[in-house]
């Protein structure tokens, strides 16, 4: 979901 994508771009 969207949250997963944000976590990937954040890296942590």
Swiss-Prot record:
The alphabetized UniProt keywords are: Secreted
Task: Note the coiled coil stretches, chain numbering.
Answer: none
Listed under GO cellular component are: extracellular region
Localization = Secreted
| Location, primary (coarse class) | secreted
Tissue specificity is: Expressed by the skin glands.
Q: Which domain of life is it from?
A: Eukaryota
Give the function comment from the record: Possesses weak insulin-releasing activity.
The protein here is known as Insulinotropic peptide 2
Instruction: Give the organism, scientific name.
Output: Agalychnis spurrelli
């Amino acid at each position: 979901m969207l949250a997963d994508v944000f976590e990937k771009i954040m890296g942590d």
